[in-house]
């Protein structure tokens, strides 16, 4: 008879609680922990105060390629890659840290939530692992952005260098607020983050 380690179960519960607090859906919890579905349902209700949402996870790779979603998912993935390269940490921990960094640095929507939810961030990593999506460097700025895995690298221009016309209408930050945010990011990067 197989006996589960109490320490491993404790780590799984802690991980599940952290993922639930960040907005993870039940299939992610089942995939990343060894806890039973019934325990995860109870834990979800304890942490969130509501039952776990039902339904399928979003599964379209096209979502990550539209202009605003592409910028947000690329920012998250670049932070994730930096953490993987610099630190010797498990991928799930790198994902959580990169997502927390994304939440801290990227502006929230008017409804208060992030554009890139944790569920989509997790799915993005799965799409990249399965080589459905990948990264391509912009030929103008040199930044790495999410594209289809085998996108021709010599023609790609990112949404920053060539924004769609609707991008101007969606701007939520005033110039002063945007400049202040950029200044704060530069100060934080100079003080705390080693270059990747």
Swiss-Prot record:
GO biological process, one term: regulation of bacterial-type flagellum assembly
Gene Ontology MF annotations: DNA binding; zinc ion binding
Location in the cell: Cytoplasm
Keywords: Activator, Bacterial flagellum biogenesis, Cytoplasm, DNA-binding, Metal-binding, Transcription, Transcription regulation, Zinc
Function: Functions in complex with FlhD as a master transcriptional regulator that regulates transcription of several flagellar and non-flagellar operons by binding to their promoter region. Activates expression of class 2 flagellar genes, including fliA, which is a flagellum-specific sigma factor that turns on the class 3 genes. Also regulates genes whose products function in a variety of physiological pathways.
Family (UniProt): Belongs to the FlhC family.
Stored SUPFAM superfamilies: FlhC-like (SSF160930)
Top-level taxon: Bacteria
Entry note: cofactor: Binds 1 zinc ion per subunit.
A cellular component annotation (GO) from this entry: cytoplasm
Cofactor: Zn(2+)
Residues binding Zn(2+), per UniProt: 138, 141, 158, 161
Pfam families xrefs: FlhC
Underlying gene: flhC
Chief place of localization: cytoplasm
InterPro entries for the chain: FlhC
Subunit (UniProt): Heterohexamer composed of two FlhC and four FlhD subunits. Each FlhC binds a FlhD dimer, forming a heterotrimer, and a hexamer assembles by dimerization of two heterotrimers.
Protein known as: Flagellar transcriptional regulator FlhC
